[in-house]
């Protein structure tokens, strides 16, 4: 059965009974995570800074019994507190938080504007902290919770011309490890996932903007040891595992999903 077809008659899934907040969840990796979470029995709070066609499509697909869409900018701490309050009001608890919302800021360090620097960190780092800080009191009260930060291979390896995005993603992995240790004894797990090149709508748009889209996609695939580009569902399955009780002894850990690219010294 397709992951995009929600079948309510199935036996309980790996996330049966859990409630998850997933930021940036109307497209790409976030939408794939939301769909798979519901497929595995969770109820989800969808989020984007825009209430657009993509948001309406995912909300309609998952249905009001299984999902709630809240428009909010993760850079706005008060908006994220309100989002968590709405999640509690709708579903009664929050078991899982997936901090997926992010943005690419790729620039030359000396040509980058102050606004670009601030926006990159306000979304890619502070956005995760704003939502985490809002949800932590509820997780601590129930002495259980799984927080999953979607970082990046850029948090491990540096590509010239991508500043300051790798700085923010390195910091996000540091935040993951620090909070994971800080709250481990109180039932909270904090882990991160670092995707490499994943065939999201944004990447497809980037390929389309290239002079020869097919050649560029083939070139990018050839850089990977597995000779193919990753799919959003492949990230989503790892998020399901980390959200589930199967991962109860995994904490303060980052998982790379890049087809082995980051481990390749030379090709």
Tell what function each PLM region has.
Residues 2-12, 157, 240, 251-267:
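Short C-terminal tail/terminal secondary-structure segment
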Residues 19, 26-27:
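Conserved glycine-rich cofactor-binding loop
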Residues 108-109, 113-121, 220:
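Substrate-binding pocket helix/loop in short-chain dehydrogenase/reductase
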Residues 129, 228-257, 262-263:
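C-terminal substrate-recognition "lid" of short-chain dehydrogenase/reductases
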Residues 132, 168, 176:
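Active-site helix of classical SDR
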Residues 137, 181-185, 248:
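Alpha-helical segment proximal to the catalytic Tyr-Lys
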Residues 152:
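Residue(s) in the substrate-gating loop at a strand-loop-helix junction
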């Amino acid at each position: 059965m397709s992951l995009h077809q929600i079948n309510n008659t199935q036996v309980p899934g790996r996330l049966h009974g859990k409630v998850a907040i997933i930021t940036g969840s109307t497209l790409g990796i976030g939408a794939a995570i939301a769909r798979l979470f519901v497929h595995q029995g969770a109820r989800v709070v969808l989020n984007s800074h825009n209430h657009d066609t993509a948001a309406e499509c995912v909300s309609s697909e998952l249905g009001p019994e299984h999902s709630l869409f809240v428009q909010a900018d993760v850079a706005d701490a008060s908006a994220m507190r309100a989002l968590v309050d709405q999640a509690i009001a709708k579903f009664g608890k929050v078991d899982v938080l997936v901090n997926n919302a992010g943005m690419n800021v790729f620039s030359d360090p000396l040509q980058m504007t102050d606004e670009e620097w601030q926006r990159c960190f306000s979304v890619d780092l502070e956005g995760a902290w704003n939502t985490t800080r809002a949800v932590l009191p509820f997780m601590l009260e129930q002495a259980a919770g799984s927080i999953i930060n979607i970082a990046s291979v850029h948090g491990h390896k540096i590509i010239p011309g991508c500043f300051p995005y790798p700085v923010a993603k390195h910091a996000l992995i540091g935040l993951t490890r620090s909070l994971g240790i800080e709250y481990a004894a109180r039932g909270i797990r904090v882990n991160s996932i670092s995707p490499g090149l994943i065939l999201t709508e944004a990447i497809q748009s980037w390929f389309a903007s290239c002079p020869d889209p097919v050649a560029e996609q083939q070139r990018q695939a050839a850089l990977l040891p597995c000779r193919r580009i990753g799919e959003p569902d492949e990230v989503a399955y790892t998020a399901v595992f980390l959200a589930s009780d199967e991962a109860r002894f995994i904490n303060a850990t980052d998982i790379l999903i890049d087809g082995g690219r980051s481990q390749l010294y030379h090709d």
